UniProtKB/Swiss-Prot annotation:
Source organism phylogeny: Bacteria, Pseudomonadati, Pseudomonadota, Alphaproteobacteria, Hyphomicrobiales
Gene from which this protein is expressed: ilvD2
Name this polypeptide is given: Dihydroxy-acid dehydratase 2
Record carries keyword tRNA processing: no
Binding site for Mg(2+): D88, D130, K131, E451
Protein source organism: Bradyrhizobium diazoefficiens (strain JCM 10833 / BCRC 13528 / IAM 13628 / NBRC 14792 / USDA 110)
Gene3D superfamilies: IlvD/EDD C-terminal domain-like
Length: 574
């Protein structure tokens, strides 16, 4: 019995390749041109979220081929497959956005089912858009087979009349156009140049935030998450990932060895330090849930509170992901956090080494101002803040990176769906100083917890970003700027306080103290609750109906199954 066959005896793929009873299974493999040696090697699933919906995922199929070469070079048998993804930039601003967050669960579920059904021994997952990144990482820790995550890379910035632009500028251009500050011709010109290449949105929006998380949490190779999609070095990272996953099989290093409580805290720290997307406060608890670790919005917020904001990245700052990669990448950011005591250095990673060991050779780059030293930060607390109060007993989240005013008080202006709020913004029928409330957009109530970028970007484009506030039980895009509070829980659909608000109620927001309150007594809120009744939904069948029945609250990551804590047998141990 050779070494490879010996390893095979403890791997899931033995159930489809070994012994006389599996002769029918082997006949299928021979039909695809596999050799006897390849059949008896470890099977590595190479999963990508490739599609032609948008530039975010268009480069993934190319990169998957490099992964397969790496797996084969290291003595494994790669098995490529695709799963779905919903691209937020295309889904934004219409009913399609209801599909976005549910797609995270669909990605995790479909990868799990494919790996289980075909008895793969390991997984390399490639993802390129907002929900596909956490969805793929959730699948990895759920299955707990040796795994490496690969980000497809960010888009290059566009150039509009000498100015660097991103898709954020496009959404804000719509607001400018609505008030006559941008002509039809200018809008046409900028939309043709804003997105010049393959790759996900280029600033520290949700995709790049979760890419940063993938390195910090230990599931991605150092530097691999920073290189833009068009850069050929991405193929080298992919080749290496294919080789490295074979080492993880040999060493039996699994995702749950990597994704520990400390690793989750590291991930939250890099989100705060980079002024990342508020969506991380949904995705980190969901990843933790797959491991059986309780790590909710309040745990994330505690890390945010004590982590300095050091990376000057858009939307709150000046630079895009390409700029950070070219001055040292995510390891440069992590190194200054580690040196100043904001990261746990003893967490194991997919390299087989610890965070501290991976960062040992990283030298500080003094010839740049993209990443500030952690002892000389942009601000001493993170770029994302958790809130709690009588309007949000289960918490809420706000991105404060780049904001100067962290307190706001004003009368509520209530809307029961995003379309109505956007129409009011487009028609300028709101007033300066109001707090726009968009409710019944939570995980159950939407269903799907839509992002409100269309509305927030229009407000910013109208020059009102600092003159109003917006709160919702839905979500915000990582591209959102301004005083915008999301994930307010409990959501309106289950009778949360946000569903009891009336126009004119005074709302007090304090991102310094971390509070979100309405100036109403407990008695008044209780009285209004007696008159509240659940709203009917139009989604009475299909995937969105199933999602609404299963999904939990935002505070726990909006998850749809009991999680690792209730697991009796892990797939990797079959």
């Amino acid at each position: 019995m050779n070494a490879k066959t010996n390893i095979k005896q403890r791997l899931p793929s033995r159930h489809v390749t070994e012994g006389p009873a599996r002769a029918p299974h082997r006949s299928y493999f021979y039909a695809m041109g596999l050799t006897t040696e390849q059949i008896h090697q470890p099977f590595v699933g190479v999963a990508s979220c490739w599609n032609e919906a948008a530039p975010c995922n268009i480069a993934l199929m190319r990169q998957a081929q490099a992964v397969k070469k790496g797996v084969a070079h290291a003595g494994g048998t790669p098995r490529e497959f695709c799963t779905i993804t919903v691209t937020d930039g295309i889904a934004m601003g219409h009913d399609g956005m209801r599909s976005s967050l549910p797609s995270r669960e669909c990605i995790a579920d479909s990868v799990e089912l494919t790996v289980r059904g075909h008895a793969y021994d390991a997984l390399v997952g490639l993802a390129g858009c907002d929900k596909s990144l956490p969805g793929m990482m959730m699948a990895m820790v759920r299955l707990n087979v040796p795994s490496i995550f690969i980000y497809g890379g960010s888009i290059l910035p566009g150039n509009f009349r000498g100015q660097q632009v991103t898709v954020q500028d496009m959404f804000e251009a719509v607001g400018k156009h609505s008030v006559g500050a941008m002509s039809d011709e200018d809008l046409d010109e900028i939309e043709r140049v804003a997105c010049p290449s393959a790759g996900a949105c280029g600033a520290q929006f949700t995709a790049n935030t979760m890419a940063t998380v993938s390195e910090a949490i230990g599931l991605a190779l150092p530097y691999s998450a920073g290189a833009p999609a068009p850069y050929e070095i991405r193929d080298a990272f992919c080749m290496t990932a294919g080789e490295k996953v074979m080492e993880l099989i040999d060493q039996n290093i699994r995702p749950r060895d990597i994704v520990t409580r400390k690793a989750l805290e590291n991930a939250a720290a890099v989100v705060a330090a980079s002024g990342g997307s508020t969506n991380a406060a949904l995705h980190l608890p969901a990843i933790a849930h797959e491991c059986g670790i309780k790590f909710d919005l309040f745990d994330v917020a505690e890390i945010f509170k004590k982590t300095p904001y050091v990376a000057d990245l858009k939307p709150g700052g000046r630079y895009v992901a390409k700029d950070m990669f070219e001055v040292g990448g995510i390891p440069l950011l992590m190194k200054t956090l580690l040196d100043n005591g904001f990261l746990h250095g003893d967490c194991i990673t997919v390299t087989g080494r610890t965070i501290a060991e991976n960062l040992k050779s990283v030298k500080w780059n003094p010839h740049q101002d993209v990443v500030h030293p952690a002892d000389k930060p942009i601000t001493v607390t993170g770029g994302v803040v958790g809130l709690k109060g009588n309007l949000a007993p289960e918490g809420a989240i706000v991105k404060v990176a780049g904001m100067s005013n962290l307190r706001f008080t004003g009368p509520a202006r209530c809307f029961d769906r995003e379309e109505d709020a956007f129409e009011a913004v487009q028609n300028r029928t709101y007033r300066e100083g109001e707090v726009i409330v968009i409710r019944y957009e939570g995980p159950k109530g939407g269903p799907g917890m839509r992002e409100m970028l269309q509305t927030t970007a229009a407000l910013t484009g109208q020059g009102m970003g600092g003159k109003i506030a917006l709160i919702t039980d839905g979500r915000f895009s990582g591209a959102t700027r301004g005083f915008c509070i999301g994930h307010v829980g409990p959501e309106a659909a289950i009778g949360g306080p946000i569903g009891l608000l009336e126009d004119g109620d005074i709302i007090e927001i304090d991102a310094v103290a971390g509070t979100l309150n309405v100036k109403l007594s407990d008695q008044e809120l209780a009285q209004r609750k007696t008159k509240w009744s659940a709203r009917a939904t139009n989604h009475t069948t299909g995937a969105l109906w199933k999602y609404a029945q299963q999904v939990g609250p935002a505070v726990g990551g909006a998850v749809t199954h009991p999680g690792g804590a209730h697991e009796k047998q892990c797939y990797a141990d079959i």
